[in-house]
């Protein structure tokens, strides 16, 4: 958006929550058109890994957060919008998980505000961070967040160096071949 403010470009296109967050931060931007549906963002694990249960647990907790309004609170905290997404679940929402290990390593990308970014106190924060922390608490497991960058986060999960990824990752057919969402 710096190119826009200096006049180097006349318009920019980005994900709606990214622009809404920039507006909320005081940037002189506006949204002047209807957006295009480009898919959805998701939490993922390596297909065939022993941590595929994390997707089910994530979705169960997400459904409960949708039901109790806490998902809406997180989204509104970081953007000006609300969500109408309906997570799918395979078991009852709110059912506690039985962790397979004491701590799960979740890889992310800290350069994608408002989803994940470093604040002025050098703390990782944003929609994805609030979401994964709330889900870990709801499901009764510990997490360790790493922020190696988007491509490195994908590689870390594929190599088994991280158990899952939450990094504003869009769900595509190609990614479905490698990841479960």
Regions found by a protein language model. Name each.
Residues 4-5, 43, 58, 135, ...:
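Hydrophobic residues within well-ordered alpha-helices
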Residues 28-37, 48, 129, 137, ...:
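Acidic, polar ligand-binding/catalytic clefts
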Residues 124-134:
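Short catalytic helix/loop segments, enriched in acidic residues and glycine
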Residues 83-124, 137:
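Immediate post-signal peptide segment of exported/extracytoplasmic ligand-binding proteins
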Residues 10-11, 30, 42, 105, ...:
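Short, Asp-centered acidic motifs that coordinate Mg2+ and/or phosphate
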């Amino acid at each position: 958006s710096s190119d826009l403010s200096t006049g180097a470009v006349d318009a920019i296109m980005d994900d709606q929550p990214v622009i809404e967050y920039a507006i909320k931060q005081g940037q002189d931007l506006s949204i002047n058109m209807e957006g295009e549906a480009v898919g959805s963002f998701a939490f993922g694990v390596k297909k065939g890994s022993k941590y595929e249960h994390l997707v089910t647990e994530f979705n169960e907790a997400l459904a409960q957060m949708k039901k109790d309004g806490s998902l809406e609170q997180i989204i509104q905290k970081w953007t000006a919008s609300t969500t109408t997404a309906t997570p799918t679940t395979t078991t009852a929402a709110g059912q506690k998980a039985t962790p397979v290990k004491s701590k799960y390593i979740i890889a992310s990308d800290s350069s994608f505000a408002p989803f994940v970014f470093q604040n002025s106190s050098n703390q990782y924060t944003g929609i994805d961070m609030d979401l994964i922390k709330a889900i870990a608490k709801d499901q009764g497991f510990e997490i360790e967040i790493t922020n190696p960058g988007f491509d490195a986060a994908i590689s870390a999960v594929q190599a088994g160096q991280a158990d899952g990824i939450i990094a504003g990752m869009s769900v595509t057919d190609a990614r479905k071949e490698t990841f479960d969402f």
